[in-house]
Amino acid sequence: MTEIIEAIKESAKRIAKTIQTTDFGYSDSANESGDQQLKLDVQSDLIIEEELSKTSSVRVLASEEKSEPITINERGKYLVGYDPLDGSSLVDVNLSVGSIFGIYENDFHGNSLKAAVYVVYGPRVEMVISTIKAERFILQNGKFLFMEELQLGEKGKLNAPGGTQQYWYPHHKALVEDLFSQGYRLRYSGGMVPDLHQILVKKGGLFSYPGTKDKPRGKLRKVFEVFPFAHVYEKAGGEAINDEGNRLLDLKAEEIHDTTPCFFGSLYEINKVREFYGK
């Protein structure tokens, strides 16, 4: 496990430098989800594959940018699912973006996730590593230095509602409006990593990406995005559930790009989700 996290650290350093120096134009290909791939997406994916391929403990790599997992070492113990540059379209407007990693054993189901890591590329580069607890690090002088253990309060003040509003179901719209009526502040950049990171650092709130009329199974992918952040939020004392009120880490990935509605937050906000969703 340690060598995997060290490889992720090296990947993050290289990606941070790439963001500073690379053309932001689009490549000629699209990823498995149909999104046109930025050159940064492609480069970030190659960097991560290169660094993780140096390890002896990784058996399989699954990238959000590729249609199928690849086996790199038959004797390896772990499977790594990752989104190399989540929110990459925000780079050209100079907003924060991130990388997300899930370290699995045996398969890519939620209960097989052993650790999660994400990186925020913003005014400074930060990393959160979630194993037994969720710990925050900052990149300084080429090294990731420990900052703090992340711990959510029971109730927060931030609301990050994803999905196109015109396609929200009435009960979800009522949930969002209820939180705003309580004085919750809107914090939504369109980047999953910085939005979820802000809620963690500010010690509470709700990030939601529901099932909608146009995307009833949600948009966010279990293996690459949802399961890793569910792990982080649980280790930080919060909860992460789907629209049925089920724990996200109890879900299975029916295929590598499987999606799900998802809600991440502190205890109060998740109970509000259950209330408005009748769960």
Swiss-Prot record:
Tell me the residue numbers annotated for binding Mg(2+) 1: E64, D83, L85
Q: GO cellular component terms?
A: cytosol
User: Where is it mainly found?
Assistant: cytoplasm
One GO biological process from the UniProt record?
fructose metabolic process
For this protein, the parts annotated as crossing the membrane are none
The pathway entry for this protein reads as: Carbohydrate biosynthesis; gluconeogenesis
The reaction(s) catalysed by this protein are: beta-D-fructose 1,6-bisphosphate + H2O = beta-D-fructose 6-phosphate + phosphate
The cross-references to Pfam families, in alphabetical order and at most eight, read: FBPase, FBPase_C
Write down how the cofactor binds this protein: Binds 2 magnesium ions per subunit.
Query: What InterPro entries does this protein's entry cite?
Result: FBPase_C_dom, FBPase_class-1, FBPase_N, FBPtase, SBPase
Instruction: Extract the NCBIfam families matched here.
Output: PRK09293.2-5 (NF006784)
Protein family? Belongs to the FBPase class 1 family.
Output this protein's name: Fructose-1,6-bisphosphatase class 1
Origin organism lineage? Bacteria, Pseudomonadati, Campylobacterota, Epsilonproteobacteria, Nautiliales
